[in-house]
Amino acid sequence: MGAAVDLLAREMSETFHDMRARLHDLTEDEFFWEPVPGSWTVFRDERGRWDHHYEEPDPEPAPFTTIAWRLTHIAMCKVMYHEHAFGPGELTWLTIETPGTPDGALDMLDAGHALLTEDLAELDDTDLERSVPTNWGEEWPAWRIFWTMTHHDAHHGGEIGALRDLYAATHRTGPDPDGG
């Protein structure tokens, strides 16, 4: 393993595990909690299948999103980036399965991360400059797939951590910390 691959692998792993630790004991109530009315989330469609709010192009301003939306977004992106950069490239946003539970989303997150970790382990430093396809048709250097997913974990993982803290602060049971 070359120095660049090793650095990407270490950073991707550390960022993922930091995010994953903040997801420990995620409840269904937290997963679906809408801190703002009209938040984008995960929901059952008219056929009873799980789906998620999504628009192209992204609306401006972007809607507020629930933990369910953010977590499934991270998980689905990992699978999609793998699928198009290193897999058969057949999966689309219309065909990928949307997980509808915390456990389902975490399972997809773990599986997607494992796929990307395996993809990176098969590369050497020169392979990182090779162009690979993305799910929206652009070509990127392979390193950018892993760099983007690391940034994605840090960005959305931080948002999820803040939402979990906000949920905990607004859903406390037991004695009032101010003594009231």
Functional labels for PLM-detected ranges:
Residues 2-95, 133-180:
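Short, contiguous alpha-helical
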Residues 97-130, 143-154:
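Acidic/histidine-rich alpha-helical segments that form the ligand environment
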